[in-house]
Curated annotation (Swiss-Prot):
PROSITE patterns cross-referenced by the UniProt entry: RIBOSOMAL_S2_1, RIBOSOMAL_S2_2
Protein name per UniProt: Small ribosomal subunit protein uS2c
UniProt keyword annotations, A-Z: Chloroplast, Plastid, Ribonucleoprotein, Ribosomal protein
Biological source species: Cucumis sativus
Main localization of the protein described in the UniProt heading: plastid
Matches recorded under CDD domains: RPS2
Swiss-Prot/TrEMBL GO biological process terms: translation
Protein's cellular compartments: Plastid, Chloroplast
Length: 236
């Protein structure tokens, strides 16, 4: 894997609050190598390590994007949801930002059935088919469509399992991470000081509670994905 320069600056990360971890009582001892200090009862993340692993993750997704690989970004908590949707939409990645439905990946056949139903209902709505149904039936299908849009809207174009999954909060998205581990899907995780750095293929130590921190990390990753896709087009 070729190493590239991704314009990752410590000052920029400090401004975004990437270095602020959790309280010192709420930590995972395995995060010790990624912590540089304690300040006012809070662990401070070593941003040099963050920059190293973020750069490594950018190299990985760039190379994967040049080969046409598919990405899924997962971040369902309120502080992450908007940033996840924007970053994914900008680079045509799949995303889950509302709720992780159990078995979304490990029980892919069920997810695929739901996606087919979702596409059929969207087609019916666009062609006016729902309006030709009795009111009660139309209302029921519209409720189904709304529910599917909420939970599957970000993966509506997904036709198979993703090649790489980017996870914003390891603890919040633990079920998603476990499904990836079960299936052998490579993962990139933002990990705060209360996480286990050994669970993901690449763990990026960072504040996973601040919107600015989440946005900065995601923006670097999706920029690398976008660059990889552009490189693939130029070289084809």
């Amino acid at each position: 894997m070729t190493r590239r320069y991704w314009n990752i600056h410590l000052e920029e990360m400090m401004e975004a609050g990437v270095h602020f971890g959790h309280g010192t009582r709420k930590w995972n001892p395995r995060m010790a190598p990624y912590i540089s200090a304690k300040r006012k009862g809070i662990h401070i993340i070593n941003l040099t390590r963050t920059a190293r692993f973020l750069s490594e993750a950018c190299d990985l997704v760039f190379d994967a994007a040049t080969r046409g690989k598919q990405f899924l970004i997962v971040g369902t908590k309120n502080k992450a949801a908007d940033s996840v949707a924007r970053a994914a939409t900008r680079t045509r990645c799949h995303y889950v930002n509302k709720k992780w439905l159990g078995g979304m990946l490990t029980n892919w056949s069920t997810t695929e059935t739901r996606l087919h139903k979702f596409r059929d209902l969207r087609t019916e709505q666009k062609t006016g088919g729902l309006n030709r149904l009795p009111k009660r039936d139309a209302a029921m299908f519209k409720r189904q469509l709304s529910h599917l849009q909420t939970y599957l809207g970000g993966i509506k174009y997904m036709t198979g399992l993703p090649d790489i999954v980017i996870i914003v909060d390891q603890q919040e998205e633990y079920r998603a991470l476990q499904e990836c581990i079960t299936l052998g899907i490579p993962t990139i995780c933002l990990i705060d000081t209360n996480c286990d750095p050994d669970l993901a293929d690449i763990s990026i130590p960072a504040n996973d509670d601040a919107i600015a921190s989440i946005r900065l990390i995601l923006n670097k990753l999706v920029f690398a994905i976008s660059e990889g896709r552009s490189s693939s087009i130029r070289n084809s």
